[in-house]
Amino acid sequence: MEKLVTQQVQNVDPKQSEILNISEIPAENPTETPIISKQKLLEAGVYFGHKASQWHPKMAQFLLKKKRNETHIIDVLKTQKMLEIAYKLVEKFAQKGAKFIFVGTKKQAKKVVEEQAVRTNSIYVSGRWLGGTLTNNRTILSRLKTMENLEKQAAENFQGYTKKEKLAKQKQLAKLQKNLNGIKGLKDVPLFSLIMLVADPLKDAIAVKEARKKGIKIIGITDSNVDPSLVDFGIPANDDSTKSITLIFTVLADAIASAKGGKKLFAYQSDENIILPEDPEKELKQTRYRNNSFEKFARQKNTLKDSQVLKPNTEIQA
């Protein structure tokens, strides 16, 4: 009989196991290709946490070290393990016919949220989350209907309207499309079948709160400053890096695609086939700051040799 994931991951919150039925998912075979190599996780910078003063105590089990005025380091081995479980959860839900809503309104998440949601025919919110998207469905559906009517009129070049009226309608349509394009499919999806995938539960706290009220399961990235109980299942990782978010969300999208017989882009692929985006300059500055803290931490604890510090192909030992 196959071992269960609950035997493999002893640190999973019992609440997560109960809500998401982790015990039903077979454990990985240690001889198989990892979902993402530790080297690739390092390259993506998933291990960068926040300053120790900003941490959330419930994330302690996923951190290598706590030191005041320094940066927390997330254990990449646990990130890898939890990402594997999250992949299997999403794949299992997709096989059972669940629909997904990708949520990431911070700039580092926008592109990957849109791309992977479109790729998997999922709903997404990458701009401002409109209050009541899930809890005041009638209002949202009314706006969607208005947008559809305007799109039909636009297809006919707003025939019968004056130039001034056309400009007003075009402006109204553009605004509606900006806010609602990603949730067009919401009108055809019963909320009980939705699973939310969120890049930052703190940034998108309203979305998380609404999902909670409607009983929608939530899988999300939990950085060192995030209360993991905000989501039903958390993946400990850096939520401020384009590379980190792209890596994790592409893997989750791979699970949906795999369940439908589609191609996997990152999950269980070789490192050379996983191309990550370049981080913007502002992120690079933040990364350099975190690198300095990590290098100091590594040398103090002799976790890595000086010649190994911060090289992408270096493994961090817990």
UniProtKB/Swiss-Prot annotation:
Keyword annotations: Ribonucleoprotein, Ribosomal protein
SUPFAM superfamilies: Ribosomal protein S2
GO process terms (BP): translation
InterPro entries linked to this entry: Ribosomal_uS2, Ribosomal_uS2_bac/mit/plastid, Ribosomal_uS2_flav_dom_sf
GO cellular component: cytosolic small ribosomal subunit
Annotated CDD domains: RPS2
A Pfam family assignment: Ribosomal_S2
Domain of life: Bacteria
A single MF term (Gene Ontology): structural constituent of ribosome
PANTHER family: 30S RIBOSOMAL PROTEIN S2 PROKARYOTIC AND ORGANELLAR, SMALL RIBOSOMAL SUBUNIT PROTEIN US2M
HAMAP family noted in UniProt: Ribosomal_uS2_B (MF_00291_B)
Family classification: Belongs to the universal ribosomal protein uS2 family.
Listed name of the protein: Small ribosomal subunit protein uS2
Organism listed in the record: Mesomycoplasma hyopneumoniae (strain 7448)
